[in-house]
Structures are given as structure tokens and as C-alpha cells.
Amino acid sequence: MSELPVVSIFTDGACSGNPGPGGWGAILRFGDKEKELKGGEPHTTNNRMELMAAISALEALKKSCQVELYTDSQYVRQGITGWIHGWKRNGWKTADKKPVKNAELWQRLDAALKPHKINWHWVKGHAGHPENERADQLARDGVAMARMQKNVRS
């Protein structure tokens, strides 16, 4: 079996108001090739946009990959590496039997990572990490797009 191609993904989400217009951005890097993705929604939350950044990046991959995914969202990293296992066992309920917030996005993220081997990395936001800063700018572009129209993606 050949080794999986290694792809680095850098994601970020942003929201103007919480809830409010929001955007997400992602950078996918394979060797010396890069692809930028961004999108937004007119009425959303910062956590939903953080999830959409990771989902959209993973869904853009056309074959199984070894993914190094970098996010400044503890919500996404802790959710996907820890909390999700209990949620699935509990029928998408929290430990105190309440419905999981953003369950449909967590389920979509769970499905999007199935074909891949993923290492999740947390980076401190707004701390000068070049790719995180670029993903943040893409997310802010997504907010601007969302203010102008309905749900958008490019």
C-alpha cells in the first residue's frame, strides 16, 4: 500500500456579532500547491463558522490523505478529539442529556474525516502564525460576503 499524500490545512472562522453574519476560511497545502477556500452565512455563530472551515476543507479533498489540520478553535479540536465520542454513544446528547449544539455540523465533520488520517493541531489565534492569519483574513472576507448576500462559498 502506498503512503497517503500529506495535506496541511489551516482553518479559521469569524463572526460579526454572535450570532450575526459570519465567515470561514481555509488554506489547503499539498507540497508547493495551495488552495484557498472561504464562505459565509448571514446569520450564524463563531463556533458554526469554525466547524464549517474544517468541514469545507476536508470535503474539498478528492482522495484519502494524511491531514495535518491546524485550528485556533479549542471548541473544534476538543470536540472532534474528545467530546464527539460521548455524544455519539449518547445519541447526540450531552452528558446532562441536552441536545448537542451544532449536531448536524459535528455529524458532517465526522463523515468528512472518515476517508482520512488526521492529526489535529491547536494554534494560538492572532499570535502571528502566518497561515492562521491568512485563514483569519479569508474568514473576514467571508463575513463581508455574507453581509452582501445570502449563504456564499468560493
Swiss-Prot record:
Belongs to the RNase H family. It catalyses: Endonucleolytic cleavage to 5'-phosphomonoester. It comes from Bradyrhizobium sp. (strain ORS 278). PANTHER family: RIBONUCLEASE H1 (PTHR10642:SF26). Its EC number is 3.1.26.4. This is Ribonuclease H. Its cofactor is Mg(2+). Mg(2+) 1 binds at D12, E50, D72.
